[in-house]
């Protein structure tokens, strides 16, 4: 395909705690391409790097717990999960795919930003004293012919972010735990209905190379009052790492890591019947599974409550 026609806009607005620039859109044969530039203060980036001691040797997710990673995502001034719908001539267009690059103004000596990020920042004349995330999203026309752009608006919407909540342990059915929502302040009580040790067949992993952990604890529970879909429960512990039982000749094959859980197996081809509980009709029954281990866990599982929170309201901006 030929390069799209650049339409310079230089539209600027403030949303979700950031200053944004929409420098240009590109009218292509199959759709519209939009570049979103989200600005971050250099000092905020420095504080974030210092707080988490991020260095070239200490920037891997494996160096941090799941809860630390969640907190880092919340605090990272260059991280915001959002969706953007385009309304073109009154018709809504959905993004089909996208990509992103970042500019960090306070990198240590000897470390440089990606060349493609530098080129994009230079092309748009972005102030290099700030940090920037440059998102590029593609919006198919939804028709065979490229339309003439008469009006163009943008609806920005934050995706729910994961906020770590309190921990609790359960020993037996009937145990309960009370907690409050960090945004609404609503008080909830979680009550355990069933708590069982279970195991998955090794055959369900369908692997000749790896031996996977198969033991887990399954818990069903109710929450009162019944919440929206913005509360979930997860195991605080990491799962056991799979063991390699046969070598792999492919040097590019993926490497097994920690944090194995049984959700994918239970919700996959074997179906949710892999978790079996007795009948219970009191309230809406929820279910959660612990991380996988090679041996049954003797101690009580420590669970974490997670909240899925939208911090900023949806907002529409006129581009053309």
What are these regions (language model features)?
Residues 1-320:
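Alpha-helical, hydrophobic structural elements that either
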């Amino acid at each position: 395909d030929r390069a799209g026609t650049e339409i310079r806009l230089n539209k600027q607005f403030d949303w979700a705690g950031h200053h944004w620039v929409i420098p240009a859109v590109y009218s292509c044969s199959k759709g519209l391409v939009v570049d979103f530039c989200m600005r971050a203060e250099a000092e905020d980036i420095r504080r974030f790097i210092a707080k988490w001691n991020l260095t070239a040797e200490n920037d891997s997710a494996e160096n941090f717990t799941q809860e630390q990673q969640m907190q880092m995502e919340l605090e990272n001034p260059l991280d915001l999960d959002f969706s953007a719908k385009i309304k073109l001539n009154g018709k809504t267009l959905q993004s089909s795919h996208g990509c992103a690059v970042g500019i960090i103004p306070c990198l240590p000596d000897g470390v440089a930003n990606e060349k493609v990020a530098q080129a994009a920042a230079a092309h748009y004349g972005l102030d290099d004293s700030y940090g920037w995330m440059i998102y590029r999203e593609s919006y198919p026309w939804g028709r065979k012919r490229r339309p003439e752009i008469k009006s163009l608006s943008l609806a920005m919407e934050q995706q729910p972010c994961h906020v770590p909540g309190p921990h609790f342990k359960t020993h037996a059915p009937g145990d309960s735990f009370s907690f409050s929502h960090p945004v609404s302040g609503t008080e909830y009580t979680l009550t355990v209905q069933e708590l069982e040790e279970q195991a998955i067949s090794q055959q369900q992993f369908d692997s000749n190379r790896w031996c996977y952990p198969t033991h887990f604890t399954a818990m069903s529970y109710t929450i009162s009052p019944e919440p929206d879909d913005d509360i979930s429960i997860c195991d605080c512990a990491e799962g056991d790492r799979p063991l390699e039982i046969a070598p792999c000749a492919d040097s590019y094959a993926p490497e097994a890591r920690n944090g194995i859980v049984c959700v994918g197996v239970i919700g996959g081809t074997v179906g949710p019947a892999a978790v079996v509980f007795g009948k219970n009709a009191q309230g809406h029954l929820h279910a959660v599974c612990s991380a996988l281990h090679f041996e049954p866990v003797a101690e009580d599982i420590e669970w974490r409550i997670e909240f899925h929170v939208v911090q900023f309201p949806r907002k529409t901006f006129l581009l053309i």
